[in-house]
């Protein structure tokens, strides 16, 4: 009975690390020393919305791997700066993805991908051809 209940729990402990790796592996590499997210060639083929999602999932992975980031969450300015995307587009897409339930927003308007939304992120990225 306890195992069945534990299967309902969402959190870092239950996070599907393979799914996180599957989402990220075609698009980015993570540098532990510099704490940078390095895009690969396939990154260029992603739409702006998917770049934001991959970036935020990469931050989630860096927290799981204990890279020493202060937080998984990122502001629109941080996302725009780190990804070279236009701030207006980032703000608009963050609001849309928050409304869709893909993202959560904390104090200070810092966004992160919900653990329970990773499957939907995978589906959205899967609809894009690599």
Regions found by a protein language model. Name each.
Residues 73, 109-115:
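Minor-groove-contacting beta-hairpin "wing" of winged helix-turn-helix DNA-binding domains
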Residues 47-51, 74, 88-92:
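Short, well-structured alpha-helical interface segments that form or flank functional binding sites
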Residues 81-99:
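Short amphipathic alpha-helical interaction segments
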Residues 49-72:
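Short helix->loop/beta-hairpin flanking segments within DNA-binding domains
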Residues 71-81:
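A short alpha-helical element within helix-turn-helix/winged-helix DNA-binding domains
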Residues 118-130:
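Short, amphipathic alpha-helical interaction segments positioned at domain boundaries
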Residues 98-108:
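A short, conserved structural fragment
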């Amino acid at each position: 009975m306890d195992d069945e209940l534990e299967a309902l729990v969402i959190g870092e402990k239950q996070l599907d690390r393979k799914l996180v790796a599957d989402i990220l592996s075609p698009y980015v590499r993570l540098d532990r020393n510099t704490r940078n997210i390095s895009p690969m060639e396939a990154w260029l083929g992603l739409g702006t919305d998917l770049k934001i999602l991959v970036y935020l999932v990469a931050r989630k992975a860096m927290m799981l791997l204990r890279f020493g980031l202060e937080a998984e969450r990122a502001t629109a300015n941080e996302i725009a700066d780190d990804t070279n995307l236009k701030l207006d587009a980032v703000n608009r897409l963050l609001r849309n993805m928050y409304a869709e339930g893909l993202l959560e927003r904390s104090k200070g308007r810092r966004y992160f991908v919900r653990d329970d939304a990773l499957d939907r992120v995978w589906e959205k990225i899967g609809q894009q051809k690599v």
